[in-house]
Amino acid sequence: VPYIDALVFPFDNSGLAAANPDRALFFPLEDKLRASYLAAVKLQTPPATLDGYLTQVVTPTLERQHSEGAVAEKFEIAYLRGFDFSDPSREEAAKVYARWVGKAHPDLADYKLLQDFLFRYIAAECGRLHMAVHLHGMSGAGSYFSIAGVNPLLLEPMFNAKRFRQTQFVMLHGGWPYVHELGALLQKPNVYLDLSQQSLVIPPRTLAGWLREWLEVFPDKVLFATDGYPFSDALGWEEAAYLASRNIRDALGIALSGMLRDREITRDRAAAIARGVLHDNAAKLYGIP
């Protein structure tokens, strides 16, 4: 699952990076990744027009990643801006692109409009290519993370739009603190959640309450995930994956035992739900064994 945010920010990002120390850390990484994507299509700078950027850079990058086995594209955009994506026309975005391509310090309002268009374009292309869209959706690292900006309800207009009904959106990390809002959004046919990171930092007893709330209504929309990442010398990916996996299984046991005790489900149904969360739901979504 490659990161794709870099293609949403094709211009000079120094103004955005100056907003706070968190973004000062992230944007140079995005710029480096974008340079590698440009190099892969034998370019050093973005094309002169939006049409050129889409047809020479964005779509070929997505198609190449899909052909190499990617089942989804990941956005960490929550670290870079909020989920308040407007719906500009291609013509509006093209004018902004032409106005600022190759120039320093693009107007922030103009640049946001272009980002909004590019995010939607990439999401639609992912649907065409049968790749899911992964969105970081949990209060994240750093002290400047905008919690209000990642309210998943901000994305509801996109989830409802006919253009994106073929795009499967996976809200990563369970959406904390918006666990109830995200649970309600699971009624959308194109919205899922996974348990990565949340399973690492939230104790099983607390996680079990949220799991039960989701599983009682949308058991086929909840996906096992660990966020097995090398966080530090003391917490490598191995430890992170083990701890998160253990926590999920403990939380799942608590949630399903409670549902059994309250006669909401049978033992066979509990086993089926557990298999779904731990394997089958993700296998069906991503088309993997």
Language-model-derived ranges and their functions:
Residues A39-A48, Y192-S199:
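Short, basic, glycine/proline-bearing loop/turn elements
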Residues V150-L154, N160-P289:
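H/E-rich (His + Asp/Glu) clusters that bind or coordinate divalent metals
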Residues V1-F11, A19-K32, V71-A78:
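Divalent metal-dependent hydrolysis catalytic cores, especially in the metallo-beta-lactamase
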Residues L16-N20, A40-K42, A208-R212, P289:
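Short, surface-exposed amphipathic charged segments that create phosphate/polyanion-binding patches used
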Residues N13-G15, S36, D84-S86, E92, ...:
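Short conserved micro-motifs at the rims of enzyme active sites and ligand-binding pockets
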Residues T49-F75, G82-V191, R205-L223:
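Histidine/acidic residue-rich metal-binding segments in metalloenzymes
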Residues A19-P46, S86-L108, I248-L256:
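Active-site gating loops and adjacent loop-to-helix segments of metal-dependent hydrolytic enzymes
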Residues P2-L7, A78, M138-G140, G174-G175, ...:
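An acidic- and aromatic-residue-enriched active-site/binding cleft used to recognize and process polar
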